């Protein structure tokens, strides 16, 4: 039987050098680590890792080749009160594995035990890691490096974006390949998108609770192997990595960046009753935030929280991010529940992971976007991230909806959000692009549902409609649900136009939810994380071509307005912005706080956004000059206006002089 050589303690994971494979695994509290390899017949062969450098266990297996399936058994104390849950009866996934063979099914054997260990061996049904070799021809690929001021983000789900697209070949719909298909790329280019932000593509598992209900985790925020691509989005699991890189290369050639939504806050092992896949059995005490009683701090709402202040976990997270940039050429990351990244346990801008990213010559050069909160006390950190990060701006989302759908927001508050929420983000040398403005996202109502539903309708999720937020700031315009009279449809359309215009012509970085430009509806489900079906898949055959054209025209208009693309804070008298009332005069203090919802925003001294958010048709006196409406607001008859615009109720128009 081949013996393991000591090998090297770096890099982490399994790496083939042409002669064999070097294996490394971090565990500060293990007493012994067994490498378990499986032959073509499924026969298991075990080897003790002979090397032990600090907290890194390592060994080298001569003559091992790519395609080898492996896992680990980690020996150590079973002391739940101390946070130790070692159980060598359970085969464990390498946290740095780049391919997984097998499925993460709901099975009692995939649990370590709660108070007492479960010593039933699970190797027969446990997923296995696969050794891969990395050879890929990137040709002349180069990152687009779109300036932040010119960035337009499109948030999409790999499967949902293309699964029903009639012009994409059936055999690749819903896959990584489809992202790089010319039809998809041409669509994104015509729309004006510069960055495709993908919901999680790292391998994830469906929670046992969902599996028992016949549902699955659709969004992917339940990670199990952070270096491995989710195989369900590949035409073949063996070629997933190349399919993904082919898509990125094609998108880059079209000038489109790729941003990955990544989950570094918790794992699919969930709470103490959850499954055992990897980290819990490798070094529970190091990888997770542990309470004094040995249970987890649940700052994520998912049962556990990764301890990103532990040096080894920081190294693991940093290596993961570098892998996606260096191996897959991704252009940035959106970090789910990113406040966890800064916990020490209190949130700090100089937290270890933030510092590591800041000091990394690779990671400090890509786009970094934070979802700036978690669910624990002190978890709401909007505006408090380090300067390298942009942040989801929920202030903007709520203000836009309140102004146009609830009519209860003063002009001053609306203007503050329109101006990149400078009261929140203008600090520490940050630029307006730090505000990622959004009206909708994967989490919540779609744009169409914002104007068709007053209440969430999440019954299909199996939680009796208890899940999902109740604070939607939506307005069904008088009838719950889709459809209705022509007047109702037109009023809803006008509200959608107003919200899109506010999003795409505001200062900051706009993020558009895929499908909002189509009129996609989830029929009132505002938490469709477990709906892998026609509720979430974009139905291209039913897309509103008029709304798509309207959205594209707004995006292309945005790119013509210097005040929006120069990425500089607006200052009084700098010519970037003037705020005027319905009479083209500067607003008084009282008008800012108590005036009617009528406003004119003059950008770059040439582009005028005239707003009438009242219930009545109102005359708006335009500033001096000859004005004409511009696409998408220009009609066939587009006369020059020199004096007054008849502003329809809840309406707006954009002019140029």
Swiss-Prot record:
Q: Which domain of life is it from?
A: Bacteria
The alphabetical list of record keywords is:
Carbohydrate metabolism, Glycogen metabolism, Glycosidase, Hydrolase
Report which reactions are catalysed by this protein. Hydrolysis of (1->6)-alpha-D-glucosidic linkages to branches with degrees of polymerization of three or four glucose residues in limit dextrin
Write out the pathway annotation from the protein's UniProt entry: Glycan degradation; glycogen degradation
What the entry lists under SMART domains is as follows: Aamy
Q: Which residues are listed under the site Transition state stabilizer?
A: 443
Is Membrane among the key words of this record?
no
**Gene3D superfamilies associated with the record:** Glycosidases, Golgi alpha-mannosidase II, Immunoglobulins
As one GO molecular function, the record gives: hydrolase activity, hydrolyzing O-glycosyl compounds
EC number(s) in its UniProt entry? 3.2.1.196
Where do the catalytic residues lie?
A: 336, 371
Extent of Basic and acidic residues compositional bias: 458-467
Q: Read off the InterPro entries from this record.
A: GlgX_C, GlgX_Isoamylase_N_E_set, Glyco_hydro_13_cat_dom, Glyco_hydro_13_N, Glyco_hydro_b, Glycogen_debranch_bac, Glycogen_debranch_GlgX, Glycoside_hydrolase_SF
Q: Write out the GO biological process terms.
A: glycogen catabolic process
**HAMAP family registered for this protein in UniProt:** GlgX
* Annotated family: Belongs to the glycosyl hydrolase 13 family.
> What does this protein's UniProt record list under function?
Removes maltotriose and maltotetraose chains that are attached by 1,6-alpha-linkage to the limit dextrin main chain, generating a debranched limit dextrin.
- The name this protein carries in UniProt is Glycogen debranching enzyme
Organism the protein comes from: Escherichia coli O139:H28 (strain E24377A / ETEC)
